[in-house]
UniProtKB/Swiss-Prot annotation:
Pathway note: Secondary metabolite biosynthesis
Chain's gene name: acdA
Cofactor annotation comment: Binds 1 heme group per subunit.
Catalytic reaction equation(s): L-tryptophan + O2 = N-formyl-L-kynurenine
Protein name: Indoleamine 2,3-dioxygenase acdA
Family (UniProt): Belongs to the indoleamine 2,3-dioxygenase family.
InterPro entries recorded: Indolamine_dOase, Trp/Indoleamine_2_3_dOase-like
Length: 405
């Protein structure tokens, strides 16, 4: 088993201050003039969304290589830009497109391979690498990542509702990200049999998740359910279900420069792709196969890791090997304070998931009942039946709490 001193979390592109968000704000524009065509296209597409010209502009975009991308933030910007363009191309029209041109598909495939995630829009392109602090906060990360101090770089709709939606997600990521160094210290404390240190951190974790839940509840301040449902949500859908009722294989055809290509089926962007939430599960020992009802969804949690940046996925795999906190806690008597503190921490994660369920109902289910929408409102943007999935994730977390004496 790896020793904590051998692990440098920055090697996994994880910040000790804000977790899976990049330590330095994402680029707002690719610096090399070679990529001006990409940046100009995205700036033309956003205002023209809905008038039928977005695909026309993208079809005019030059086919560029990734050879002039140098540093990691440039790769992040390229992935964000290309994946958003792919979403606009698929969904901005009366009917979804079942193809994306080589000018998007070819570099998107290359960039995604470099970053180790699927070549489609994801939580990383919507949130991690597309939200940045605005204003001057120096090294005060807590202030910089309050939702009101965040701004969106590239938008689908140009609405403040969309910006607020993703700013809330980024604020939650930053809030929980600062727990990561303490997780390593707590795993080491459990190895050493230091119950007091483990108990203290569980209290810290519970408080942090409670604040994450408060951040989530702020969604209502700046994102109207109707705007999210009708304007933002359609662009978060995946291409997996496109053409599923025709003679084609289904999904989206990624064209290449020689005129050929390949069919791909990918889910849409979803908070289930948050590495932070899966990390909390891993650290606390939440087992998503613990209930019979959740069996069909167990694989979905694993599938969502393929939509995470490769280094983040490797980090979760590392933490899965190291995690020992639940096992350590259960070695204590039923009445021990450490078991009570563990259950409190787990209960806060249950509350976060319950809040998410309520919000999903208000923003999607209730909006779907108010009017018709051609796309299935029972499915989340990640492509699964989302209410049963959210309920089962909550129930598995609840089942993780220590039995009461």
């Amino acid at each position: 088993m790896a020793d904590r001193s051998d692990i440098i979390i920055e090697n996994y592109q994880v910040s000790p201050r804000i977790g899976f968000l990049p330590d330095k704000p994402p680029l707002a524009r690719l610096p090399h003039p070679y990529y001006a065509g990409w940046e100009e296209t995205i700036s033309r597409v956003a205002p023209s969304r809905g008038d039928g010209r977005a695909r026309e502009y993208i079809d005019e975009m030059p086919l560029l290589s990734t050879g002039k991308l140098r540093v990691l933030p440039e790769w992040h910007r390229a992935y964000t830009l290309l994946s958003i363009l792919s979403q606009v191309y698929i969904w901005d029209g009366d009917e979804p497109s079942n193809r994306i041109p080589a000018s998007i598909a070819s570099p998107l495939l290359a960039v995604s391979e470099h970053l180790g995630l699927n070549p489609c829009a994801s939580f990383a392109s919507f949130c991690l690498w597309n939200i940045r602090p605005v204003g001057r906060h120096g090294l005060n990360y807590a202030a910089a990542y309050e939702p009101e101090n965040l701004g969106q770089i590239t938008s689908f709709t140009g609405t403040t509702d969309e910006e607020w939606f993703f700013s809330i997600s980024a604020a939650i990521e930053a809030r929980g990200g600062c727990l990561i160094p303490g997780m390593f210290d707590t795993i080491e404390a459990a190895r050493e049999g230091n119950s007091q240190r483990v108990q203290e951190f569980l209290g810290t974790l519970a408080s942090c998740v409670r604040h994450m839940c408060k951040d989530l509840k702020r969604m209502y301040e700046g994102c109207a359910p109707s705007v999210f449902y009708h304007d933002v949500r359609p662009f978060l859908n995946g291409g997996k279900g496109v053409n599923k009722d025709t003679q084609t294989p289904g999904g989206v055809f990624y064209e290449n420069e020689s005129g050929g290509g390949q069919w791909h089926q990918y889910q849409g962007g979803s908070n289930a792709q948050s590495s932070l939430i899966q990390l909390l599960d891993i650290f606390l020992g939440v087992d998503h196969s613990i209930t019979a009802a959740n069996k069909p969804h167990e694989g979905y949690h694993r599938e969502m890791q393929s939509y995470m940046p490769g280094k983040h996925r490797q980090f979760l795999q590392l933490m899965s090997r190291l995690s020992n906190v639940r096992e350590f806690v259960l070695c204590h008597p039923v009445t021990a304070e450490i078991r009570i503190e563990y259950s409190r921490a787990t209960a806060e994660l249950v509350a976060l998931r319950q809040t998410h369920m309520i919000m999903a109902s208000r923003y999607i289910v209730m909006q779907g009942r108010k009017g018709s929408m051609c796309r299935d409102s029972s499915k989340g943007t990640g492509g699964t039946e989302f209410m049963p999935f959210l309920k089962d994730a909550r129930d598995c977390t609840l089942a993780t709490c220590c039995p009461r004496p």
